[in-house]
């Protein structure tokens, strides 16, 4: 374990919906990689307790997906609130990356950041203002080199840790097939 300002912080959230004004975070996970995308450590995977009235706001897609994955049951049984999840996640990150240095990394990470800003501002402040958004590369590939997209498939479990692992693998794939860096 070594703090390094070149390490990257990967985050994924699962939420009760897409609107941070009306929906809540129900799971958070994080991974730290080095600059070459090698996984250095997996952070805590935390289901965040939400009351039944918040879970009832989920649409059919969220309800089915998060029930079938077991996440709804984990949320109902969880003893973690948002503050405890923030504290545990920051304690993990502090071992690997100084505050304010790493961009927030992930797939469609702007959406996750909106939720962090609204519901976990202390954690959101831990990241640099920049993003490494794998979905941006996917959208550019779709337009400029669509044949590349056929070579990478996601399982799509919609569990936070699985999603981060897939995002890292996807970026490695794009690095190999698109970038000559």
Swiss-Prot record:
Per UniProt, residues of the Exonuclease domain are 8-171
Cited InterPro entries:
Exonuclease_RNaseT/DNA_pol3, Oligoribonuclease, RNaseH-like_sf, RNaseH_sf
- Record's keyword annotation contains Zinc-finger: no
EC supergroup of this enzyme: hydrolase
Question: What Pfam families does the record tag this protein with?
Answer: RNase_T
Main location per the UniProt record:
cytoplasm
- Disulfide bond is among the record's keywords: no
Report the family membership. Answer: Belongs to the oligoribonuclease family.
| Classification via PANTHER family | OLIGORIBONUCLEASE, MITOCHONDRIAL
Q: What is this protein called?
A: Oligoribonuclease
Q: Which organism is it from?
A: Aliivibrio fischeri (strain ATCC 700601 / ES114)
Lineage per the UniProt record = Bacteria, Pseudomonadati, Pseudomonadota, Gammaproteobacteria, Vibrionales
User: Which gene holds the coding sequence for this protein?
Assistant: orn
């Amino acid at each position: 374990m070594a703090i390094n300002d070149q390490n990257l912080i990967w985050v994924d959230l699962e939420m009760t919906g897409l609107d941070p004004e009306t929906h809540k975070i129900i799971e958070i996970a994080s991974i730290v990689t080095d600059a070459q995308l090698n996984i250095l450590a997996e952070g805590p995977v935390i289901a965040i307790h939400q009351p039944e009235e918040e879970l009832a706001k989920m649409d059919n897609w969220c309800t089915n997906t998060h029930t079938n994955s077991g996440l709804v049951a984990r949320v109902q049984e969880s003893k973690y609130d948002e503050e405890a999840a923030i504290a545990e996640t920051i304690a993990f990150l502090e071992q690997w990356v100084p505050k304010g240095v790493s961009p927030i990394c992930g797939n469609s990470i702007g959406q996750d950041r909106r939720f962090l800003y609204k519901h976990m501002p202390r954690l959101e402040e831990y990241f640099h203002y920049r993003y490494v958004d794998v979905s941006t590369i996917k959208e550019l590939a779709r337009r400029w080199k669509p044949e590349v997209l056929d070579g990478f498939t996601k399982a799509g479990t919609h569990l936070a840790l699985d999603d981060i692992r897939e995002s890292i693998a996807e970026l490695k794939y794009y690095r190999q097939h698109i970038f000559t860096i």
